[in-house]
Amino acid sequence: MSLSEPDHELVVAELGREPTAAEVALFENLWSEHCAYRSSRPLLSAFESEGDQVVVGPGDDAAVLALPEPDAADTPAAERDADDYGDQYVTFGVESHNHPSFVDPVDGAATGVGGIVRDTMSMGAYPIALLDSLYFGGFDRERSRYLFEGVVEGISHYGNCIGVPTVGGSVAFHDGYEGNPLVNVACVGLTNEDRLVTATAQEPGNTLMLVGNGTGRDGLGGASFASEDLAEDAETEDRPAVQVGDPYAEKRLIECNEALVDEDLVLSARDLGAAGLGGASSELVAKGGLGARLDLDSVHQREPNMNAMEILLAESQERMCYEVAPEDVARVEALAERFDLGCSVIGEVTDGNYVCEFAGAGKGEDDADDSDAESEVVVDVDAEYLADGAPMNDLASESPTQPDRDLPDPEPSLDEAVESVVSAPSTASKRWVYRQYDHEVGVRTAMKPGDDAAIMAIRETASTDAADLAPADQGVGLALSSGANPNWTETDPYEGARAVALENATNLAAKGAVPLAAVDCLNGGNPEKPEVYGGFKGIVDGLADACADLDAPVVGGNVSLYNDSVEGPIPPTPTLALIGTRKGYNAPPAALDADSAGDSELLLIGAGGADGGALGGSEYLAQAGGTDRFPTLPDTETKSLADRVASLAAVARHESTFATHDVSDGGLAVALAELVTDAAGADVTLPDRVAVFEETPGRLVVQTTDPEAVAELAGELPVLRLGEVTTDGALSLSVGDDETAFDADTIRELRGVIDRELA
């Protein structure tokens, strides 16, 4: 990729001269789709991003949110006021590493984790949790399995080594990702009002320092690489654009960053990600309306004879750029040495242009001493123009149409249908994935992977000593969910994206939590194709409308376009990561309770599709064939999505509730199968096949000993008695005139397809 002729003309007009080679490379990367959001930024104003809980919103390395006090944690966000929030903050961010993970799945995924963790650190926060949402081609394809295994290995190795638990996420398999997998990773950090740092440079005369690994040539041009379709030979030709991670250096950098923030040495910070040092340093000073003067020869390097462009644009990992007061430089250097990290004074903040000087006498380990070489100015541009001056694209779009109803004829038997849906790789157990993650490191994980949402314990004491830990009904439980369903958004981008938001919110509600805020990772194909851009617009608008109705401000995110290859574009994929709160962290599991079986009933809270139900976007149709319109979500005129979710959360928190599980991928067939244990089963009656397999979100299966109390809490939401909880460890289904049953061993075998195939 090179700077386009129209962009080149704009740069020449701005500079009043021809740009240098280093300037051309900087503009090429910082004005790329990956950095500048040239095709998506015009659409992003649809998102609401404000609220009393929002301390730092979109535009920084990560969002910062104030946590409610424990007694207000169950209250919906719209009903809280500013006084309900304390001085304890969480950071929340999400990133994609899609193209790199296709070329090199292990390093591509690993460095995606490293990048979002450093985004968290740059806000003065300590990372406490990761979530990964992963999308691959058909599980039956060898290439997809290779990418799947490599990506999970990369995430698990990096996350485990740095001591940050991966506590949740999602995995989907769909033929549309065969030529371009998606790796979306979210990170949550913990900080407070006194430790908050931003990526806004503060004052001319302050020192700019680089701390972390030495700069090499890996990841060169990564931003521009991520802004193009994947070519057929990308796996070999684009390998230099993939970064190489070092999790042990990242762990030392995490602890060093913590020490720097503890001593109040950091005035502003930015991690080195897309476009490397050039991107981080120019964006840092641009946000402050300032400039900088950098000495590129001062950058500590791990390879000899690097030129100015390589030093500026290499995306070598585990590096941070800090603004520091001149009198604190020696202390920063001492702390970097303590943690065995490289450290360089690379320049200063100015009130002029963004200027870089280079003589070719860098700090590479094998370089000869050439300190007498004369420096020349290789970059001299206005920082704000470089960071924010890219013109936006005005692209044509075509709105997608809903498919007609064409159900399979003859339809499979009930036995066959349930077996195929429960054993589908997208709905099957993901135990093979999360068992590779150390999800308990940090002693905060109260609800582990495999449930609807993870819950992290935010205690009122900072101690991790078991004797000091607060009871499970004290403190704030932080609920986390992330994911998207490509079947939904391929069928109907707008309604599918609304469903993605509601489904993630229902995951939180199933554990008794209400939404606090969201971040999104908007993935699409080549936006220059009108039908692709139309689908992308649909997921943006759908997600924006649903999050607004959920009272969940969208406080940050990431856009990844040009996920297109010789196989075609990916389905529009709006990964949503949602964070919620509840008082305490003792939530009902997604597993039936045998001890209360004789005294409890199984209820379904919430309606199916408002149009009587539809199977569009369902796993049932993905397995059996056929098409249908996407289900119409519940009417929000009389009861908002936020009110619906609050009612479901209240049900989950009620003392009579022993188990809860949301209905989503695979419909009730999968939800019920996942609830069954060796000791507890379910005997369920449903009116028809649509009721078994439709995937309308916003519904909760509840095991309760007090159905009347649950119905009262549900308010206007429909309540359907599904049947009884049994002690035989079997799922028995009566659907119209059909009946079928599966014992716990059979269900375990069906759901264990990924473990079995990858053993």
From Swiss-Prot:
Please give the function described in this protein's UniProt entry.
Part of the phosphoribosylformylglycinamidine synthase complex involved in the purines biosynthetic pathway. Catalyzes the ATP-dependent conversion of formylglycinamide ribonucleotide (FGAR) and glutamine to yield formylglycinamidine ribonucleotide (FGAM) and glutamate. The FGAM synthase complex is composed of three subunits. PurQ produces an ammonia molecule by converting glutamine to glutamate. PurL transfers the ammonia molecule to FGAR to form FGAM in an ATP-dependent manner.
Q: How does it associate, per the subunit comment?
A: Monomer. Part of the FGAM synthase complex composed of 1 PurL, 1 PurQ and 2 PurS subunits.
Enzyme category, top tier: ligase
Residues bound to Mg(2+) 1 are 95, 558
The Gene Ontology CC terms held by the record are: cytoplasm
Belongs to which family?
Belongs to the FGAMS family.
Q: What is this protein called?
A: Phosphoribosylformylglycinamidine synthase subunit PurL
Organism, by scientific name, is Halorubrum lacusprofundi (strain ATCC 49239 / DSM 5036 / JCM 8891 / ACAM 34)
One GO BP annotation of this record: 'de novo' IMP biosynthetic process
Q: Where does this protein hold ATP?
A: 37, 520, 557
Q: Where in the cell is it found?
A: Cytoplasm
Binding of Mg(2+) 2 occurs at: 119, 271
Q: Which residues bind substrate?
A: 96-99, 118, 243, 315-317, 560
